[in-house]
Amino acid sequence: MASLGQIIFWSIINIIIILAGAIALIIGFGISGKHFITVTTFTSAGNIGEDGTLSCTFEPDIKLNGIVIQWLKEGIKGLVHEFKEGKDDLSQQHEMFRGRTAVFADQVVVGNASLRLKNVQLTDAGTYTCYIRTSKGKGNANLEYKTGAFSMPEINVDYNASSESLRCEAPRWFPQPTVAWASQVDQGANFSEVSNTSFELNSENVTMKVVSVLYNVTINNTYSCMIENDIAKATGDIKVTDSEVKRRSQLQLLNSGPSPCVFSSAFVAGWALLSLSCCLMLR
């Protein structure tokens, strides 16, 4: 039979073991709670020569001075951009991004780590990482950024042609797109034999102007000019009647995600109505 001293001794040992386990669990939960935070990237294509956005969000943290945002690009030594202690730190920025990047500093505390990229270049395409560290923990997410050129087409009646024809023009595309015509009346018809498409290189020797002419068109019919490459798809519609001409155009960025990014414009009887609805696509 164990003595009173032995009972007390083993009781103390058991209490120590239980307390140690509890402390380990508390520390473990504390570390895990601070170690990982959710970082989400959104992706869309960059239009060469224009400004673009690499979108990234994270769990908000009101402690601005404790937030670190780093943008990195695969294959590039140094950083694309860094924001810490409430301001930009560009001491390690790669030279190809100098003077071209900025974060939305006033939105960092609400979880916006998106990067504004000025004057998008063809070489900006690639895999980027959005790395975040806050007082709550750290996390990162990747996104694929495509670059090219895309623009909305405009369709007009070509009164200079020998027969009724339509002229579809789009000022900037890259890579070279495909062009196809469609008709509401003649659905499924192949218009390749009654259309002519040309590509004219622009002055910067990268993007190209797209011109396509459709011949032998009929009145009271709606025609569509569709321009598409691996980045974007644009459609221009036109309906010519005896009394008026109605036009509509739409540009859709082709990226994986639940919501497409769509720009659209409608022109009815000479009056223009412009609407823009752009939804960033969740990667």
Curated annotation (Swiss-Prot):
Keywords: Adaptive immunity, Cell membrane, Disulfide bond, Glycoprotein, GPI-anchor, Immunity, Immunoglobulin domain, Lipoprotein, Membrane, Repeat, Signal. It is a lipid-anchor; GPI-anchor. Belongs to the immunoglobulin superfamily. BTN/MOG family. It is found in: Cell membrane. It comes from Mus musculus. Negatively regulates T-cell-mediated immune response by inhibiting T-cell activation, proliferation, cytokine production and development of cytotoxicity. When expressed on the cell surface of tumor macrophages, plays an important role, together with regulatory T-cells (Treg), in the suppression of tumor-associated antigen-specific T-cell immunity. Involved in promoting epithelial cell transformation. Residues 1-24 form the signal peptide. GO terms for cellular component: external side of plasma membrane. This is V-set domain containing T-cell activation inhibitor 1. InterPro entries: BTN3A2-like_Ig-C, Ig-like_dom, Ig-like_dom_sf, Ig-like_fold, Ig_sub, Ig_sub2, Ig_V-set, IgSF_BTN/MOG.
